[in-house]
From Swiss-Prot:
It comes from Herminiimonas arsenicoxydans. It is an enzyme of class 2 (transferase). It comes from the Bacteria. GO terms for cellular component: cytoplasm. Its main location: cytoplasm. PROSITE patterns: NDPK, NDPK_LIKE. Disulfide bonds: none annotated. This is Nucleoside diphosphate kinase. GO terms for biological process: CTP biosynthetic process; GTP biosynthetic process; UTP biosynthetic process. Major role in the synthesis of nucleoside triphosphates other than ATP. The ATP gamma phosphate is transferred to the NDP beta phosphate via a ping-pong mechanism, using a phosphorylated active-site intermediate. Keywords: ATP-binding, Cytoplasm, Kinase, Magnesium, Metal-binding, Nucleotide metabolism, Nucleotide-binding, Phosphoprotein, Transferase. Belongs to the NDK family.
């Protein structure tokens, strides 16, 4: 299996619930290493830039408004099969459809306030990581 990196964001709803540590424990318990992390209050421009691929979608404005509604925790995870592993930990986008024991089933309230974001593919992960972390701030360990 390949060692991969993926971008993970703990969204404003989960940060407000004070569950960052519980989510980090799940990452580490699954063998994912946190190799870069920072808390941020995203600006509208940052959120719009990050989610630009969705700019034509009807939910875009609500998504951006939500992502700037409070601080987020942004991290890079590294490990074997990190992208798929992280997506399995997150669960389905809609927490009502997420498997019991996943981050979204346990901590998310709705399809909009769904606790976490994760890269969906290796190419996306590279772009998303570069968006928030210049290479000099990411450390394999």
């Amino acid at each position: 299996m390949a060692i991969e990196r993926t971008l993970s964001i703990i969204k404003p709803d989960a940060v407000a619930k004070n569950v960052i540590g519980q989510i980090y424990s799940r990452f580490e318990g699954a063998g994912l290493k946190i190799i870069a992390a920072r808390m941020a209050q995203l600006s509208r421009a940052e959120a719009e830039g990050f989610y630009a691929v969705h700019s034509a979608r009807p939910f875009f404005k609500d998504l951006v408004d939500f992502m700037i509604s409070g601080p987020v925790m942004i991290q890079v995870l590294e490990g074997e099969n990190a992208i798929a592993k992280h997506r399995d930990l997150m669960g389905a986008t809609d927490p009502k459809k997420a498997e019991k024991g996943t981050i979204r089933a346990d901590f998310a309230d709705s399809i909009d306030a769904n606790a976490v974001h994760g890269s969906d593919a290796e190419e996306t992960a590279k772009v998303e990581i570069a968006y928030y972390f210049p290479a000099l701030n990411v450390y394999s360990r």
